[in-house]
């Protein structure tokens, strides 16, 4: 798993702070990597044992550039903790507007920050959210930012968040809402701007029935539009019978995974790796061609074909094949 993850040039790990941040989007529920306990005297205690083991394991395989921690704004706004007084799990159901929410997260993040600093991980840690409302993001940002945390979001474009998010991954096509000035300002501050696809995108995508070239097209789309990369929201969220049926609830077949149990890859996953490697080669060639206007113009012409996401699978194959010939010759 980690070897394949590394071959896809993954540089960030996703950690889970509270139980089940994504609700019904996954077949298997996610336990927290930080164990939160409310002591009998009303104070909070946190056990980072699992979190530490996970981050250290990822780092062994080179997945150590960024740690995205989910989520201050989970899908059901329900936070589970162990209650010593009742000797049972209890839940806080709340909203981002309440004092209860602010108290819960201020306590959690203060302790978490101290632990991250001790481990040397604070600067590369983001508090991450997934497709949350602008108002909730701003409320959460106030709390996290006051303690010096950086924040990440995979979701819709919001102008109010452009200068705030360290890692802003927008839905495919919403990247067109960024102005060139916004993208330049984010890049100057070392902020990351990427795109993602999900069940809302018919094509291009990496469903079971998508043409393989679509997976290669997506990272090249990011390269053509001056973005830092491409994210698919899930790659091993298996359903009940992942080897025989890739459908899951409302999601398109294969949307929740492209890598299979038993260390089995897929054509679409391998074509995605191909696209990621081509993205990296494009970045290298852009630097090399600064003093070679002829080759620079050729590369830019080929990339122009990837600037629009309004394509079908057959178009993706044609565009990918054309740029592959050029990249393989360089």
Region annotations inferred by a language model:
Residues 1-4, 19, 53, 57, ...:
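Short, hydrophobic/amphipathic alpha-helical patches that form generic packing surfaces
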Residues 53-54, 114-115, 179-184, 256-259:
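Intrinsically disordered, low-complexity boundary segments flanking structured domains
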Residues 167-251:
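Catalytic-core region of carbohydrate-active enzymes that cleave or remodel glycosidic bonds
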Residues 63, 191, 290-294:
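Residue-level recognition of short, well-ordered coil/turn positions
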Residues 117, 135-154, 159-170, 174-193, ...:
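Eukaryote-skewed repeat-based solenoidal scaffolds used as protein-protein interaction platforms
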Residues 79-81, 89, 93-157, 227, ...:
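Catalytic domains of carbohydrate-active enzymes that cleave complex glycans
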Residues 1-147, 154-163, 236-241:
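Aromatic-lined carbohydrate-binding surfaces of glycoside hydrolases
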């Amino acid at each position: 798993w980690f070897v394949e993850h590394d071959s896809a040039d993954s540089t960030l790990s996703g950690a889970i702070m509270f139980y089940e941040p994504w609700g019904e989007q996954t077949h298997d529920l996610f336990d927290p990597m930080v164990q939160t306990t409310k002591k009998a005297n009303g104070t909070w205690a946190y056990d980072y044992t699992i979190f530490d083991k996970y981050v250290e394991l990822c780092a062994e395989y080179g997945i150590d550039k960024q740690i995205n921690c989910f989520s201050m704004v989970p899908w059901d706004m329900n936070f589970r903790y162990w209650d010593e007084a009742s000797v049972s799990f209890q839940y806080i159901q709340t909203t981002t507007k309440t004092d209860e929410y602010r108290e819960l997260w201020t306590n959690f993040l203060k302790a978490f920050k101290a632990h991250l600093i001790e481990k040397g991980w604070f600067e590369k840690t983001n508090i991450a959210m997934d497709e949350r409302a602008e108002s909730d993001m701003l409320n959460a940002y106030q709390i996290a930012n006051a303690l010096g945390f950086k924040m990440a979001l995979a979701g819709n474009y919001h102008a109010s968040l452009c200068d705030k998010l360290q890692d802003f991954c927008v839905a495919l096509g919403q990247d067109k809402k960024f102005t060139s000035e916004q993208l330049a300002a984010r890049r100057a501050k070392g902020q990351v701007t990427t795109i993602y696809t999900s069940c809302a995108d018919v094509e291009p995508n990496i469903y079971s029935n998508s043409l393989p070239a679509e997976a290669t097209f997506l990272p090249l789309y990011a390269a053509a539009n001056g973005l830092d990369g491409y994210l698919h929201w899930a790659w091993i969220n298996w359903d009940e019978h992942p080897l025989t049926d890739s459908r899951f609830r409302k999601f398109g077949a294969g949307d929740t995974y492209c890598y299979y149990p038993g260390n089995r890859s897929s054509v679409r996953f391998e074509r995605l790796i191909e696209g990621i490697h081509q993205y990296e080669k494009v970045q290298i060639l852009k630097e090399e061609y600064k003093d070679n206007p002829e080759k620079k113009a050729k590369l830019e012409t080929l990339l122009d074909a990837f600037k629009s996401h309004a394509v079908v699978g057959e178009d993706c194959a044609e565009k990918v094949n054309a740029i592959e010939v050029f990249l393989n010759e360089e």
